[in-house]
Amino acid sequence: MAKKSLIYREKKRQKLEKKYHLIRRSLKKEISKIPSLSEKWKIHGKLQSLPRNSAPTRLHRRCFSTGRPRANYRDFGLSGHILREMVQACLLPGATRSSW
């Protein structure tokens, strides 16, 4: 189980990313449309004045049940060992263990 503080920090980053998503996207569109370099620098300064944790690259995918940051399956939102336990307990519909 991950520390609660790390899970809350990640949730805070997700909220910030949602809050500044439209602003960040509009500034990036402006940068691509404007040909002059001086105007691009001004808009780039506005982009850098946004909070650091509002950038989508700062987000990290975590397991829903344990908060584990590694070995996550996107389809389920679970880490590998929790996914294995749930499949063995038949808690995930349609998921079967492979055997050959």
Swiss-Prot record:
Main localization, broad class: plastid
GO biological process, alphabetically ordered: translation
RNA-binding recorded as keyword: yes
Keywords: Chloroplast, Plastid, Ribonucleoprotein, Ribosomal protein, RNA-binding, rRNA-binding
Localisation: Plastid, Chloroplast
Single annotated GO MF: structural constituent of ribosome
GO CC terms, sorted: chloroplast; small ribosomal subunit
Pfam families assigned: Ribosomal_S14 (PF00253)
Family: Belongs to the universal ribosomal protein uS14 family.
Subunit and interaction comment: Part of the 30S ribosomal subunit.
Function: Binds 16S rRNA, required for the assembly of 30S particles.
Protein name: Small ribosomal subunit protein uS14c
Organism the protein comes from: Arabidopsis thaliana
Top-level taxonomy: Eukaryota, Viridiplantae, Streptophyta, Embryophyta, Tracheophyta
Gene name for this UniProt entry: rps14
